[in-house]
Amino acid sequence: MSTVRRILVTGATGNVGRRVTAELVAAGAYEVRALTRCPETAGLPPVVEVRRGDLSDAAGLAAASEGVDAVFLMWPFHSAESADAVVAAIGRHTERVVFLSSGSVRDGVEPDAQSTPVGRWHRAVERRIEESVPAWTHLRPSAFAANTRWWAGQVRVGDVVRGAYGALPTLLLHEADIAAVAVRALTEGGHTGAAYALTGPEVLTQAQQVRIIGEVLGRPLRWEELSRDAARRRLLADDGFPDTFVEPLLDGYAQMMTAPRPTVTGTVEAVTGAPARTYRQWVAEHAADFV
């Protein structure tokens, strides 16, 4: 496998992609190319080569992939329909892909037999990558800590956060930890063929997460349980999420409520040498998002 010098980051202005880009730039040893829909507002470091485009444009993606040694690939779609075109466009130009997959994917299970919609489409993309790229690494993160920003609107106007499945246990993961693992997989040897299950360091219910936000902000926040239908209406109307996102989300939550309690992995520390950050750390760093 050739030495990695030039790296393409897709989703470079997102929670994880921006961190990946920043770490690669800080290392000072790589040429970083970023793919974004709007270069004018990307706000990336001047040394980054910014290309206009997205994963829905296979031709543009192929052009952005020319001359790169590795690609950080995220998947913004709610299906795997375009996976063949996307992976083919990348695979013609690079030998190494680090894919931001999902913790919903289950090992040894075919895409169509995965237990959640998210697991099905992410495993389908994984399969395309495995068939097309010689050096691949899948990152399967647990829930993103950043996703709890969707409570910010409720937190700003009161001390009650309303939603469904407040007892749902999750392993919230800091985006900086995902990025740190991604950078090592992009730039180091020894990660080919790995599917890393990445988790935060503690199991927290949604109600506990709300309480932690309140403790960091110095406010008595509490969770109020809604029915699934009421939560769906809130997510669609008040929070503005599309139905294609809300239904798989709630389906996944319902299945997770009856699944075995999630297990903390030590993968972040094993790969990076540093323990995974806590949710309280994430909230402290992003407290301004809730005020």
Task: Specify the residue positions occupied by each region the protein language model found.
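Oxidoreductase cofactor-interface core, primarily capturing Rossmann-like NAD(P)-dependent enzymes
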Residues: 2-45, 56-59, 66-68, 77-84, ...
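Acidic/histidine-enriched alpha-helical segments
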Residues: 226
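Cofactor-binding loops of NAD(P)H-dependent oxidoreductases
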Residues: 53
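Hydrophobic alpha-helical packing elements
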Residues: 60-64, 279-282
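A hydrophobic C-terminal alpha-helical subdomain
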Residues: 229-291
